[in-house]
Amino acid sequence: MKLLEEFIKEKGTVLPGNVLKVDAFLNHQIDPGLMQEMGKAFAERFQDLGITKIVTIESSGIAPAVFAGLALSVPVVFARKKKSVTLTDNLYTSTVYSYTKKESNDISVSKQFLTDADTILVIDDFLANGQAALGLLEIAELAGAKVAGIGIVIEKSFQQGRELLNKTGIPVYSLARIASLENEGILFLEEE
């Protein structure tokens, strides 16, 4: 998605350790116009798959997931990283490792909001090592839900995440695919 690539080039910052900081439009401050276009792009790609719900992880996946949900006219469910007094029982839970935070988190979805009647689209902000998406796939499997596709905002194609997700046989679509974050700047792969 050329618009997203422009945002990444203009407002993204490469940090040591192959970390891409995009808090100017995605991870801290959110650009609603960009989110709307991303939601439309995900909807166009997955509209014919019978999606009944979108599933993501808090917090940076929520905005793109909500805009995709608007475009597809389906609800959005986000896996919580922290338990709260209102989210204690009847949960599907998986453990995921965060590449940027260098820690593992249990993520949970209430059984009330995900069932074997659902066909879901998983949406996440980044694909690096694939752990977040795999955790959501595990939750879907526990619920008996069908996963029709995986939508990624920014994929670091030089890391193993895409390879791991491809092994699941579930279609993966990334709006921006980064080939490298080297000294010469951010290099993108061609659009899918």
Swiss-Prot record:
Its EC number is 2.4.2.22. GO terms for cellular component: cytoplasm. It comes from the Bacteria. The keyword Glycosyltransferase applies. It catalyses: XMP + diphosphate = xanthine + 5-phospho-alpha-D-ribose 1-diphosphate. Xanthine binds at residues 20, 27, 156. InterPro entries: PRibTrfase_dom, PRTase-like, Pur/Pyrimidine_PRTase, Xanthine_PRibTrfase. GO terms for biological process: purine ribonucleoside salvage; xanthine metabolic process; XMP salvage. Coiled coil: none annotated. GO terms for molecular function: xanthine phosphoribosyltransferase activity. Keywords: Cytoplasm, Glycosyltransferase, Purine salvage, Transferase. Converts the preformed base xanthine, a product of nucleic acid breakdown, to xanthosine 5'-monophosphate (XMP), so it can be reused for RNA or DNA synthesis. PANTHER family: HYPOXANTHINE/GUANINE PHOSPHORIBOSYLTRANSFERASE, XANTHINE PHOSPHORIBOSYLTRANSFERASE. Belongs to the purine/pyrimidine phosphoribosyltransferase family. Xpt subfamily. Homodimer. This is Xanthine phosphoribosyltransferase. The lineage of its organism: Bacteria, Bacillati, Bacillota, Bacilli, Bacillales. The gene is xpt.
